[in-house]
Amino acid sequence: MIFKNKIKVESDHKEVTFHNVTAAVKETVKNSGIKDGIVVVYSHHTTCSVITQECAFDMSMTGRETLQQDLVDVFEKICPSYTREGLYLHPGPKALKFAEEHGEDARGCHNTEAHLISSIIGRNVTAVIDEGEIDLGEFGFIYFIDWDKTRGRTRTVQIIRQGACKKAGGW
């Protein structure tokens, strides 16, 4: 059987936004009745990523978990925030014109680093469902990350489960 649903998360317009979606994913797996299979957590947004990581417990000065802040800091060195024209080739004049024709503010196009980071990390996580539970390891969590700092938005997280379900009266 295959089950699919979506959850919505709200992103900040000024900074990278992390959302712990573990509880929602576990709930959807539980409600599906899948005993053994896989779950895929996916973003169709090209400036977002889905990762598995442990909870750091400690908080940074920014209010993020320390591992989350470390990830942001590492990627700021690899793909710096778009702070000046010419830092990246994208967006070019055609991309800006396309955005304008589709009702987008040109400033929202200056999110090249978010596209690059999403491409490097990826936009999905696949985990095993074993005996009805998601195998994330002892300390694993699933995070949805919006790398786009140009505008706040409602983002969609897709959760797809596939596997063998318990049948009435046995397996």
Label for each model-derived stretch:
Residues 1-171:
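Active-site histidine-anchored catalytic micro-motif
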